[in-house]
């Protein structure tokens, strides 16, 4: 794995300053399960120079209703969403989706933000050392489109005036 700087942000303000300072050279993590594996296997088209960890920031793990909106903090674990009484009563589809996401271990550790921001699940994308330089990595081709793609997204499988890609919805 290439070297990178790791910042443990103590506050939202500190995280925002680091994001502003490093811009596109940085990635925000709260555990980094997804991105660290990609970095280790040299999968990313551009390797981040900085990882900004927000895991220790207080107050980012909440579920609350405000007016007609449900607000969920970035660090709220999937299991907490699945078990929350308010979510189960007023937003049962969300509770069910959270309860069926991944394995129990991942639900206990994984956050809603990490789940939303996780990278593409396409096995062509995940081949180590960028052996398949696909559209998602800046290439010109989607290998899953004509290859083995039975577990890929049905959304975005064709694009107007562009090469098809089946990776729209990880």
Where are these regions (language model features)?
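C-terminal structural segment of proteins
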Residues: 1-170
